[in-house]
Curated annotation (Swiss-Prot):
InterPro entries: LolA/LolB/LppX, OM_lipoprot_LolB. It holds the Pfam family LolB. A lipid is attached at C19 (N-palmitoyl cysteine). Keywords: Cell outer membrane, Chaperone, Lipoprotein, Membrane, Palmitate, Protein transport, Signal, Transport. This is Outer-membrane lipoprotein LolB. Residues 1-18 form the signal peptide. Belongs to the LolB family. It comes from Glaesserella parasuis serovar 5 (strain SH0165). One of its GO terms (biological process) is protein transport. Coiled coil: none annotated. It is found in: Cell outer membrane. Plays a critical role in the incorporation of lipoproteins in the outer membrane after they are released by the LolA protein. The gene is lolB. The keyword Nucleotidyltransferase does not apply. The keyword Plastid does not apply.
Length: 210
């Protein structure tokens, strides 16, 4: 499995040509001048619209930063159900790609060279891939700007999810929504930054479909 998980870095290390890299995207958000309560009617209306988006796809760029390395990739996220979604990462400078596919048996990781592995323990596989626990099942909702109902999150004056923290297996992820696509209803995230103290994930979503 070392060769397969190592391929993630080898696949993504290729710089993205012809476009502005997500690695240079800002990480800070403008702190809300007014914090909107969770029972606010407009926020609840927005939340209801997000909840109705069941199957969707998101395409854009993914960036990873740690003390040891930096890399970026194109990504294609296809979500159908909680046990049927996939993430494909690729470079426009190489034919190499890597795919994560969630199914009822767990998760399968495969590469463009034909290697694959399936694990029932999704959390363990994600930790092997990026080195720390990452809640990819919850991420399926976060990427829409939809928080968990009982979580401690912040809503900005535009009735958008602004930020929240999420602890998983001793790792605290700080999630910030830096920018939204405001030319569509409901507003959907354009730039999301996740940090855990030593690692930063930047996700820029260029295209939404649902």
């Amino acid at each position: 499995m070392k060769k397969l998980t190592k391929l993630l870095s080898l696949t993504l290390l290729f710089a993205l040509a012809g476009c502005h890299s997500v690695l240079d995207a800002p990480t800070e958000i403008t702190q809300p001048s007014v914090t909107i309560p969770h029972n606010d009617a407009k926020w609840q209306q927005h939340l209801a619209q997000l909840t109705q988006i069941n199957a969707y796809s998101a395409k854009g760029q993914f960036g990873y930063i740690s003390p040891e390395e930096r890399f970026s990739s194109h990504f294609d996220w296809q979500y159908k159900t909680p046990t049927n979604f996939g993430l494909t990462m690729s470079s426009n400078l190489s034919s190499k790609s890597l795919k994560l596919q969630r199914n009822v048996y767990g998760m399968t990781i495969s590469d463009s060279e034909g290697r694959s592995r399936t694990e029932a323990d999704v959390a363990m596989l994600m930790e092997e891939i990026i080195g720390v626990s990452f809640p990819i099942d919850q991420f399926a909702y976060w990427v829409k700007g939809q928080p968990e109902q009982q979580s401690n999150y912040v809503v900005n004056e535009k009735r958008q999810l602004a930020q929240f923290d999420y602890a998983v297996n001793g790792t605290l992820w700080k999630v910030r929504f830096v920018e939204y696509h405001e030319d569509r209803q409901p507003n959907l995230p354009k730039l999301i930054v996740l940090e855990n103290g030593s690692q930063t994930l930047k996700i820029r979503i260029d295209h939404w479909a649902y």
